[in-house]
Amino acid sequence: MGKIKVGVVTARWNQEITSKLEEGAISYLEACEDVEIFAALVPGAVEIPLACQAFLEAGCDGVVALGVVIRGDTSHYDYVCNSVTDGVTRLMLDYKKPIGFGVLTTENEEQALARAGGDHGNKGEEAAQVTMEMIGLTQEIPAAMKTALMLAKKAPAKAAKKPAKAAAKTQKKKKKVRK
């Protein structure tokens, strides 16, 4: 098996925070064996799904999505959060490939900083961990299912003989009782 290809999509909006998320994600991925990292910057959070899609279409095994959306005085926050979340989720299901969701949706800048290497860890690193775990899982499940199917194909032949033998024994017992 070749190298695992992972895309990292980072929004430039709130770049003082997103750059820390990106550092955490890339640092984690660089420590993994046989991983090839591809990175792209996008203007804002709404553009994240399109860049994720481009990476998946180009053959990446998974993507890390990084951004920061901080609540303001208007409903724009809700639309952006829903748009990004729905877009990334749809891509995962359509492409059957994992996207680690490291898009912070916070009430203020302090909360975002706390999650970009502060008191609450680095959510960029965590998103990279999730991506790698899910790449492994999505590769293991088909292999395990194939093995299980192969075992199941062998098992019914043995199981079919057992009921026939049991039925024959039952018939012999019935004959003995009738005599």
Swiss-Prot record:
Catalytic center residues: H76
Keywords, comma-separated and alphabetical: Riboflavin biosynthesis, Transferase
Record keyword Transferase present: yes
GO cellular component annotations of the record: cytosol; riboflavin synthase complex
Gene3D superfamilies found in the cross-reference section: Lumazine/riboflavin synthase
CDD domains cross-referenced by the UniProt entry: Lumazine_synthase-I (cd09209)
SUPFAM superfamilies: Lumazine synthase (SSF52121)
Keyword Transferase appears in the UniProt entry: yes
Catalysed reactions, as listed in the record: (2S)-2-hydroxy-3-oxobutyl phosphate + 5-amino-6-(D-ribitylamino)uracil = 6,7-dimethyl-8-(1-D-ribityl)lumazine + phosphate + 2 H2O + H(+)
EC number of the protein: 2.5.1.78
Transmembrane segments: none
Annotated spans, Disordered: 157-179
Source organism, top-level taxon: Bacteria
One Gene Ontology biological process: riboflavin biosynthetic process
Positions annotated to bind (2S)-2-hydroxy-3-oxobutyl phosphate: D73, T74, R115
Pfam hit, one: DMRL_synthase
Pathway: Cofactor biosynthesis; riboflavin biosynthesis; riboflavin from 2-hydroxy-3-oxobutyl phosphate and 5-amino-6-(D-ribitylamino)uracil: step 1/2
A GO molecular function held by the record: 6,7-dimethyl-8-ribityllumazine synthase activity
Residues making up the signal peptide according to the UniProt record: none
Role according to the record: Catalyzes the formation of 6,7-dimethyl-8-ribityllumazine by condensation of 5-amino-6-(D-ribitylamino)uracil with 3,4-dihydroxy-2-butanone 4-phosphate. This is the penultimate step in the biosynthesis of riboflavin.
Sequence similarity: Belongs to the DMRL synthase family.
Protein name: 6,7-dimethyl-8-ribityllumazine synthase
Species of origin: Bdellovibrio bacteriovorus (strain ATCC 15356 / DSM 50701 / NCIMB 9529 / HD100)
Name of the gene this protein is made from: ribH
